């Protein structure tokens, strides 16, 4: 196609988990999608049980099949042994290949090249590559941490990793171990594949020791709890990448959406990176679908921005807790500075004066569309709650105000929901001061916007 333009409804930049999941979701909605990107450098990564469940839920069956035998977790943190939980060890090169197979199965057009430039175009965007120019109505940026200017950033960290050889075969396993100036992670897939990774302050890696020397220090520390590492040797070349938690604009322009790490990148210590990347696909695909349908961009931008800020704050709180725990056990400069930096990012905002329960018009994710709906805003749920047990709260409240003598059964018929679900929603409204009488309050499951 060199020299002329190829057109699709959506261009997705980045063929990792977030990009592929979003591209496949858009194909299920009937849109034409071109996906740009190549597989990452081969290394081992941890895939949590809930990330695996999400791959399966999203229909990414080839990628889900990469998770084989669960790996036990071990090591030390906060002065205590780590032994709880497990994760699956996947080779990122194989995972990315499987993701591309999933994309092909859904009919996504895959271009194994990178975008050299992105330019606004009439009604959309132009993507320039080495082979030519592509046009699309919507642009999904899923290129990871390097995408866009950071609006928020955690401590400046870098991850240094390298493959290992001469690791004795055993069951899949991961280990975490704190150092005075960082922490290291080891993963073995049980079939001879193994990797060691060091996370340290960016400035700390320039303190004189070579990358290979620093990684050998990690191996020596890890060998204290894993005898199989005593004879391990570094293989190939070390690989460095940015590892700072990062927040970017989720919707920088109409028809332009950031997904996965491009919008919110997690602190590596949290172990939730792949899950968060996959979970962004629903909102990103709905944003694209809503824009292509000709609806207003303002609710889409607001929804994506508020969602990203909420995910960012959750990620920062998780990181702050981890670093504070280790700083108490190892009060060195690295741990105290990282813990302090996250605590500063987490400083409480001035609280809004808000009654216990109030109704507001807010954007919500309604299936595959983002639209404005009345939601119940509470102190615990400042973004608002739209549904409880799949019952739309505003419609329920409107019905009960119009029919004050009606019972749960009548409301259930009106809303086409089960009486049990309606009773649950009535109980939730009463508990938050949004309904003065009627119903009971069983256990409920609230749905955020």
Model regions and ranges:
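Glycine-rich FAD pyrophosphate-binding loop
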Residues: 15, 27-45
């Amino acid at each position: 196609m060199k020299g002329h333009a190829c057109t699709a409804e959506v261009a997705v930049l980045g063929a990792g988990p977030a990009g592929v999941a979003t591209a496949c979701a858009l194909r299920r909605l009937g849109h034409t999608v071109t996906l740009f990107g190549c597989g990452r450098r081969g290394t081992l990564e941890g895939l949590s049980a809930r990330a695996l469940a999400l791959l399966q839920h999203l229909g990414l069956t080839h990628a889900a099949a990469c998770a084989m035998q669960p790996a036990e977790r071990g090591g030390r943190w906060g002065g205590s042994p780590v032994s709880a939980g497990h994760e699956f060890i996947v080779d990122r090169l194989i995972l990315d290949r499987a993701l591309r197979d999933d994309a092909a199965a859904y009919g996504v057009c895959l271009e194994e090249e990178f975008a050299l430039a992105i330019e606004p175009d009439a009604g959309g965007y132009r993507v320039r590559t080495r082979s030519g120019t592509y046009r699309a109505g919507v642009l999904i940026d899923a290129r990871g941490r390097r995408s866009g200017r950071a609006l928020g950033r955690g401590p400046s960290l870098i991850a240094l990793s390298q493959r290992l050889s001469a690791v004795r075969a055993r069951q899949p396993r991961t280990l975490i171990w704190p150092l005075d100036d960082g922490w290291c992670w080891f993963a073995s897939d049980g079939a001879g594949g193994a990797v060691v990774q060091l996370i340290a302050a960016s400035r700390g890696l320039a303190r004189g020791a070579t990358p290979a020397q620093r990684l050998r220090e990690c191996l020596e520390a890890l060998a204290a709890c894993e005898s199989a590492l005593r004879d391990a040797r570094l293989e190939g070349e070390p690989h460095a990448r940015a590892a700072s938690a990062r927040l970017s604009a989720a919707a920088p322009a109409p028809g332009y959406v950031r997904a996965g790490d491009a919008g919110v990148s997690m602190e590596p210590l949290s172990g939730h990176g792949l899950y968060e990347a996959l979970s962004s696909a629903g909102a990103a695909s709905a944003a694209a679908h809503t824009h292509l349908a000709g609806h207003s961009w303002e609710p889409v931008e607001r929804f994506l921005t508020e969602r990203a800020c909420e995910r960012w704050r959750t990620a920062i709180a998780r990181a702050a807790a981890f670093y504070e725990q280790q700083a108490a056990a190892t009060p060195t400069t690295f741990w105290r500075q990282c813990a302090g930096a996250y605590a500063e990012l987490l400083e409480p905002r001035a609280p809004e004066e808000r009654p216990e329960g109030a109704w507001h018009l807010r954007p919500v994710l309604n299936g595959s569309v983002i639209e404005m709906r009345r939601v119940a805003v509470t102190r615990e749920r400042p973004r608002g709650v739209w549904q409880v047990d799949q019952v739309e709260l505003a419609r329920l409240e409107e019905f009960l105000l119009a029919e004050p003598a009606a019972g749960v059964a009548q409301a259930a018929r009106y809303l086409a929901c089960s009486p049990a679900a309606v009773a649950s929603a009535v109980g939730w409204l009463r508990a938050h001061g949004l309904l003065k009488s009627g119903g009971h309050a069983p256990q409920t499951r609230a749905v955020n916007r």
